Each structure stands twice: as structure tokens, then as C-alpha cells.
């Protein structure tokens, strides 16, 4: 058994795009919190844009990591969920406007956040949760989502984005594949293919993608593609090599 940081660097390399692929059975929420915790701890200006959850949901989970994100001055939350699914009852700190397949409308609050808070590019991170919801709600099509990611990479040194895959969701699979071709690294979580193991959540695969960023020789173990077993805990995840766990058939 080992901790996640022994296999995955706490903060992605500069000028990187990290793709997180999950399923309904194996969501990647713990990876969001892993990156969020370390980015805020490192004083990175961190923008968190979600299309599926509320600030309170993430704040409760992050308290288990020993961090109150609501008090962090370098944390900027953008509520894309309310923009898509709920009428605006009162002005929020940063609220995405109504949109119909228009990139600037969807991501205007992000640009506003960067401009108003004088982000330093070298020390900036954006985490986008469930970007595929933009496609399934017809807010943006796949091509425009990819274009938006390219534009965001001009504003943030590190971009972390996730897509949730599933058998009934062929469009999400296609979107994930398209973003994967743009990414420097992909981290995917999927259920066990057969059998079960006590406490094991599923498989965690770390993969270098076509645009993998390298500056000199990286001495971290993350340079190697690998597949591990993992167990989600209240404050992170425990990781096991395949030989450490016996599956119960």
C-alpha cells in the first residue's frame, strides 16, 4: 500500500493539460480534491469551475483534508451548475450567464475572475468538473468545448478537466478521446472488470498523452505509465500495486 503522492505529483507541470476520466461507479472527485488541496497549499491562484456540484459540497469534503477552502484568498469558485440548471435568485460572487452554444458566454466568469484578481500565469491553475455536461445539455458542442480548453490554456499554466464516461454516453466517450489528444497526461478511474476486493474501489491508470510536457529529466515516478488498484478514503486515496491485493471471485 502507498499514498497517492508517491505515484502522482501534487501539482501538474507548467503548461499542462491534465484529463481526468471517471465513470458513474468510479468518480474522480478525490482527484479534484487532491489537486485542489496541493494547489492552494502551494499558494497557486486556483479557479474551480463546476457544472455538477455546489461549493458547500466541496467545502465539506475539503474539511476532511484539513482545509477550509472558503477562507482561502487564492481560491476562486465559479458556479456553472446553477447557470445550467437553476434560475438566478440573487447575484453570486461569480455567476456564469445564460448561454446557447457560445464559448465566451459560458466562460466569461472565468476570464472576469482572472482579470479582476491579477492572476500570475506561472502560478495559476483551473480545475473544471464535469465539462461533458456542457455537451449533454447542448450548452456547447464538442468542437467548441475543445476550443474553450485551448483558450483557457492561454490564461492558466495548469488546466485540469474531467469527463465522466459510461456505456449509455457515447458522446462523452468521444469528447474524452478528443480532449485526450490535446492532453499532456490522462488519469482514468474505472471499476474492477471482474470479481471484487474488500475496500478496493477500482483501477487507477496514469498515462502520458501525446502532448506530454517534459523539461529536462523528471525524477518523479509519475513519468512511467502505470495501472494501480485504489481505495477512496475520506481524505484522499490509498494505492496498491496489483500484486498486493487478491480479488475475491
Swiss-Prot record:
Source organism phylogeny: Eukaryota, Fungi, Dikarya, Ascomycota, Taphrinomycotina
Pathway: tRNA modification; 5-methoxycarbonylmethyl-2-thiouridine-tRNA biosynthesis
Encoding gene per record: elp6
Assembly behavior: Component of the elongator complex.
Any one annotated GO CC term: elongator holoenzyme complex
Domain of life of the native organism: Eukaryota
Official protein name in the record: Elongator complex protein 6 homolog
One GO-annotated biological process of the protein: regulation of cytoplasmic translational fidelity
Keywords from the named record: Cytoplasm, Nucleus, tRNA processing
Species: Schizosaccharomyces pombe (strain 972 / ATCC 24843) (Fission yeast)
Family under the similarity heading: Belongs to the ELP6 family.
Major location category of this protein: cytoplasm
Compartments in which it is found: Cytoplasm; Nucleus
Function recorded in the entry: Component of the elongator complex which is required for multiple tRNA modifications, including mcm5U (5-methoxycarbonylmethyl uridine), mcm5s2U (5-methoxycarbonylmethyl-2-thiouridine), and ncm5U (5-carbamoylmethyl uridine). The elongator complex catalyzes formation of carboxymethyluridine in the wobble base at position 34 in tRNAs.
CDD domains to which the protein is assigned, alphabetical: Elp6 (cd19495)
Amino acid at each position: 500500500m502507498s499514498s497517492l503522492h508517491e505515484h502522482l505529483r501534487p501539482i501538474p507541470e507548467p503548461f499542462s493539460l491534465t484529463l481526468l476520466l471517471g465513470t458513474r461507479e468510479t468518480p474522480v472527485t478525490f482527484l479534484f480534491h487532491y489537486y485542489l488541496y496541493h494547489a492552494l497549499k502551494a499558494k497557486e491562484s486556483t479557479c474551480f469551475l463546476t457544472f455538477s456540484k455546489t461549493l458547500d459540497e466541496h467545502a465539506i469534503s475539503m474539511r476532511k483534508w484539513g482545509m477550509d477552502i472558503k477562507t482561502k484568498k487564492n481560491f476562486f469558485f465559479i458556479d456553472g451548475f446553477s447557470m445550467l440548471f437553476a434560475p438566478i435568485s440573487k447575484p453570486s460572487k461569480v455567476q456564469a450567464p445564460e448561454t446557447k452554444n457560445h464559448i465566451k458566454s459560458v466562460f466569461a466568469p472565468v476570464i472576469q475572475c482572472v482579470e479582476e484578481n491579477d492572476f500570475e500565469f506561472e502560478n495559476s491553475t483551473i480545475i473544471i468538473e464535469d465539462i461533458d455536461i456542457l455537451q449533454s445539455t447542448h450548452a456547447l458542442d464538442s468542437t467548441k468545448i475543445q476550443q474553450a480548453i485551448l483558450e483557457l490554456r492561454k490564461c492558466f499554466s495548469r488546466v485540469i478537466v474531467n469527463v465522466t464516461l459510461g456505456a449509455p454516453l457515447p458522446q462523452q466517450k468521444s469528447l474524452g478521446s478528443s480532449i485526450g489528444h490535446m492532453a499532456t497526461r490522462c488519469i482514468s478511474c474505472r471499476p474492477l472488470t471482474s470479481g471484487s476486493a474488500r475496500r478496493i474501489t477500482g483501477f487507477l491508470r496514469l498515462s502520458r498523452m501525446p502532448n506530454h510536457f517534459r523539461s529536462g529529466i523528471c525524477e518523479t515516478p509519475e513519468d512511467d505509465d502505470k495501472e494501480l488498484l485504489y481505495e477512496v478514503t475520506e481524505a484522499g486515496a490509498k494505492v496498491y500495486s496489483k500484486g498486493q491485493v487478491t480479488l475475491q471471485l
